[in-house]
């Protein structure tokens, strides 16, 4: 690859056309939006890079102290070390990634554990209708309807395109919910809280949309 092909010398740079779902292995879960004729939602444009955006910069996380907590309306509250989380059944998901700041990175391959697997293990109670994702960076949170959190293509990921997630991109583990704007895919995940009522997170408190569907351009609450 020449410098012209990758002007930023960026390992995440995509030269040429984005990966397509039909090129994926048979076991890979394909996010439905990658099969659209036009994969770029309204108001978005494709980036070949993977920009880094966050609210306050990466937190300092000692991997030996990292934990994922499953709390709230569950029959069995659970806590996982990183090794314990990675020992669960793994999935790979092929999806697109849409930032509310109007860029989209197409054709990402994630490796991790399905959110459905986690909800099953903690036995989320029937009255749970929402989740609040808690991150390690200064108490940052984001909310999701339970059905979005439990979509087949949603997971907690520790690899992107075959390599471990860097701290800048949310490593060691981040939430990935492909059919929502990317702020809903919380970096540096610390806990998942199952709730009866919706509860606005960090950006939602500032006016961002509670649902965040990119195909309906739900960027802000005023966009209702």
Language model segments and positions:
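Structured, non-membrane catalytic/scaffold regions adjacent to prosthetic-group chemistry
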Residues: 2-224
């Amino acid at each position: 690859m020449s410098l012209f092909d990758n002007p930023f010398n960026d390992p995440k740079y995509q030269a040429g056309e984005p990966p397509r779902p039909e090129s994926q292995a048979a076991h890979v879960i394909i996010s439905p939006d990658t099969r659209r004729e036009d994969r770029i939602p309204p108001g978005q444009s494709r980036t070949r890079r993977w920009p880094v955006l966050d609210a306050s910069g990466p937190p300092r996380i000692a991997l030996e102290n990292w934990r994922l907590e499953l709390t709230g309306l569950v029959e069995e509250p659970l806590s996982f070390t990183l090794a314990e989380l990675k020992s669960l059944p793994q999935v790979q998901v092929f999806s697109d990634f849409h930032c509310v700041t109007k860029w989209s990175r197409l054709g990402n391959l994630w490796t991790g554990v399905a959110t459905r697997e986690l909800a099953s293990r903690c036995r989320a109670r029937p009255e749970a209708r929402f989740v609040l994702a808690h991150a390690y960076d200064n108490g940052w949170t984001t909310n999701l309807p339970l059905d979005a959190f439990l979509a087949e293509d949603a997971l907690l990921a520790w690899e992107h395109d075959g390599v471990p997630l860097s701290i800048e991109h949310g490593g060691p583990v981040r939430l990935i919910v492909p059919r929502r704007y990317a702020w809903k895919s919380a970096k540096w995940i610390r806990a998942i809280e199952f709730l009866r009522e919706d509860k606005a997170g960090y950006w939602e408190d500032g006016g961002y949309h509670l649902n965040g569907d990119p195909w309906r351009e739900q960027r802000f609450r005023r966009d209702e």
